[in-house]
Protein backbone atom coordinates (compact mmCIF):
# COMPACT_ATOMS: atom_id res chain seq x y z
CA UNK A 1 0.00 0.00 0.00
CA UNK A 2 2.89 2.37 0.75
CA UNK A 3 4.17 1.94 -2.81
CA UNK A 4 0.72 2.73 -4.19
CA UNK A 5 0.57 5.91 -2.12
CA UNK A 6 4.02 6.92 -3.37
CA UNK A 7 3.11 6.33 -7.04
CA UNK A 8 -0.40 7.78 -7.05
CA UNK A 9 -0.32 10.62 -4.55
CA UNK A 10 2.45 12.54 -6.29
CA UNK A 11 3.42 16.18 -5.80
CA UNK A 12 1.93 18.48 -8.40
CA UNK A 13 -0.75 15.98 -9.36
CA UNK A 14 -2.92 15.45 -6.30
CA UNK A 15 -1.23 17.83 -3.90
CA UNK A 16 1.00 20.88 -3.88
CA UNK A 17 2.35 23.34 -1.36
CA UNK A 18 -1.03 25.01 -1.01
CA UNK A 19 -3.31 22.04 -1.86
CA UNK A 20 -2.88 19.89 1.24
CA UNK A 21 -4.82 18.94 4.37
CA UNK A 22 -8.28 20.54 4.49
CA UNK A 23 -7.50 22.34 1.19
CA UNK A 24 -6.44 19.14 -0.56
CA UNK A 25 -7.61 17.72 -3.87
CA UNK A 26 -10.02 15.28 -2.20
CA UNK A 27 -11.64 17.75 0.22
CA UNK A 28 -15.29 16.91 0.70
CA UNK A 29 -14.64 13.21 0.07
CA UNK A 30 -14.45 10.50 2.72
CA UNK A 31 -12.04 7.59 3.09
CA UNK A 32 -11.88 4.70 5.53
CA UNK A 33 -9.49 1.80 6.06
CA UNK A 34 -10.84 -1.70 6.61
CA UNK A 35 -8.34 -4.03 8.24
CA UNK A 36 -8.25 -7.63 9.43
CA UNK A 37 -5.72 -8.88 11.95
CA UNK A 38 -4.99 -12.43 12.98
CA UNK A 39 -4.15 -11.69 16.59
CA UNK A 40 -6.77 -10.96 19.23
CA UNK A 41 -7.70 -7.31 19.86
CA UNK A 42 -5.71 -7.18 23.12
CA UNK A 43 -2.49 -7.77 21.18
CA UNK A 44 -3.08 -4.47 19.32
CA UNK A 45 -3.78 -2.35 22.39
CA UNK A 46 -1.15 -0.01 23.84
CA UNK A 47 1.65 -2.24 25.18
CA UNK A 48 0.29 -5.27 23.29
CA UNK A 49 2.77 -7.54 21.52
CA UNK A 50 1.60 -6.44 18.06
CA UNK A 51 1.70 -2.72 18.86
CA UNK A 52 -1.07 -0.17 19.07
CA UNK A 53 -3.40 -0.41 16.04
CA UNK A 54 -3.98 3.35 16.14
CA UNK A 55 -0.25 3.85 15.61
CA UNK A 56 -0.09 1.19 12.88
CA UNK A 57 -2.80 2.98 10.90
CA UNK A 58 -1.62 6.55 11.54
CA UNK A 59 0.61 6.76 8.41
CA UNK A 60 -2.30 5.74 6.16
CA UNK A 61 -4.78 8.04 7.87
CA UNK A 62 -2.35 10.96 7.76
CA UNK A 63 -1.57 10.34 4.07
CA UNK A 64 -5.27 10.28 3.20
CA UNK A 65 -5.89 13.49 5.13
CA UNK A 66 -2.81 15.09 3.55
CA UNK A 67 -4.53 15.00 0.15
CA UNK A 68 -7.82 16.26 1.59
CA UNK A 69 -9.91 13.24 2.56
CA UNK A 70 -12.05 13.25 5.68
CA UNK A 71 -10.91 9.99 7.28
CA UNK A 72 -13.34 7.84 9.24
CA UNK A 73 -12.47 5.59 12.16
CA UNK A 74 -11.28 2.32 10.59
CA UNK A 75 -13.20 -0.93 10.49
CA UNK A 76 -10.87 -3.36 12.25
CA UNK A 77 -11.65 -7.05 12.66
CA UNK A 78 -9.33 -8.77 15.12
CA UNK A 79 -8.77 -12.48 15.57
CA UNK A 80 -9.38 -13.40 11.93
CA UNK A 81 -7.26 -16.51 12.18
CA UNK A 82 -5.63 -18.33 9.31
CA UNK A 83 -2.29 -19.52 8.05
CA UNK A 84 -2.23 -22.31 10.59
CA UNK A 85 -2.40 -20.03 13.65
CA UNK A 86 -5.43 -20.60 15.86
CA UNK A 87 -6.53 -18.85 19.01
CA UNK A 88 -9.85 -20.66 19.32
CA UNK A 89 -11.78 -23.62 17.98
CA UNK A 90 -13.16 -23.51 14.43
CA UNK A 91 -16.80 -23.34 15.57
CA UNK A 92 -16.16 -20.43 17.91
CA UNK A 93 -14.12 -18.66 15.25
CA UNK A 94 -16.88 -19.07 12.61
CA UNK A 95 -19.49 -17.73 15.03
CA UNK A 96 -17.35 -14.68 15.83
CA UNK A 97 -16.64 -14.13 12.14
CA UNK A 98 -20.37 -14.02 11.42
CA UNK A 99 -20.79 -11.50 14.26
CA UNK A 100 -18.03 -9.33 12.77
CA UNK A 101 -19.67 -9.46 9.33
CA UNK A 102 -23.04 -8.51 10.84
CA UNK A 103 -21.49 -5.58 12.75
CA UNK A 104 -19.82 -4.34 9.54
CA UNK A 105 -23.09 -4.68 7.59
CA UNK A 106 -24.80 -2.69 10.35
CA UNK A 107 -22.19 0.06 10.21
CA UNK A 108 -22.18 0.56 6.44
CA UNK A 109 -25.52 2.43 6.22
CA UNK A 110 -24.42 4.85 8.97
CA UNK A 111 -21.01 5.78 7.52
CA UNK A 112 -22.26 9.06 6.06
CA UNK A 113 -23.29 10.17 9.57
CA UNK A 114 -19.98 9.35 11.27
CA UNK A 115 -17.68 12.23 12.17
CA UNK A 116 -14.16 12.03 10.72
CA UNK A 117 -11.02 11.56 12.77
CA UNK A 118 -10.00 15.08 13.89
CA UNK A 119 -6.92 16.48 12.18
CA UNK A 120 -5.49 19.97 12.20
CA UNK A 121 -6.06 22.20 9.16
CA UNK A 122 -4.52 25.32 7.67
CA UNK A 123 -6.35 27.68 10.03
CA UNK A 124 -4.90 25.83 13.04
CA UNK A 125 -1.28 26.90 12.37
CA UNK A 126 0.43 30.24 12.56
CA UNK A 127 2.43 31.79 9.70
CA UNK A 128 5.47 29.62 10.62
CA UNK A 129 3.48 26.38 10.48
CA UNK A 130 3.29 25.95 14.27
CA UNK A 131 0.08 24.90 16.00
CA UNK A 132 -1.61 28.02 17.38
CA UNK A 133 -1.29 28.62 21.13
CA UNK A 134 -5.08 28.52 21.62
CA UNK A 135 -5.63 25.23 19.75
CA UNK A 136 -7.23 22.45 21.89
CA UNK A 137 -4.59 19.93 20.77
CA UNK A 138 -1.78 22.16 22.07
CA UNK A 139 -1.79 20.35 25.42
CA UNK A 140 -0.10 17.36 23.76
CA UNK A 141 3.09 19.28 22.97
Model-derived features: positions:
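Helix-loop-strand module that forms the ligand-binding subsite of alpha/beta enzymes
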Residues: 1-61
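Glycine-rich phosphate/pyrophosphate-binding loop and the adjoining helix
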Residues: 47-141
